[in-house]
């Protein structure tokens, strides 16, 4: 299995190309992906939660730099609203370990 420390699975507003470009300041490479065992929910913002038999369809942003991460963390309000966690997603090229933003326990 591949492990991409410079990759982020997205499932909400960051699915939109214009939003991604506005946040990181440049175009980024993406691939389609699925996260098994989580479902997408919405309160004030989109978030995902563990759920048996669920699947979240999204994308993986590839090749993120430390500056990209700084901007993304600020956008996602880490650590107040979200925290980064490692997950395994399914892509057309097989499984991939990457990061995802999960809600903090007291946010939802």
Feature names for model-found ranges:
Residues 1-108:
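Glycine-aromatic micro-motifs
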């Amino acid at each position: 299995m591949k492990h991409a420390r410079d990759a982020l699975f997205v499932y909400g507003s960051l699915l939109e190309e214009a939003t991604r470009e506005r946040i990181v300041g440049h175009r980024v490479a993406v691939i389609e992906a699925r996260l098994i065992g989580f479902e997408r929910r919405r309160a004030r913002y989109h978030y995902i939660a563990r759920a048996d038999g669920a699947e979240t369809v999204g994308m993986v942003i590839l090749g993120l730099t430390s500056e990209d991460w700084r901007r993304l963390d600020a956008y996602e309000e880490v650590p107040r609203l979200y925290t980064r966690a490692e997950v395994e997603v399914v892509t057309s090229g097989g499984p991939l370990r990457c990061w995802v933003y999960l809600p903090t326990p007291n946010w939802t």
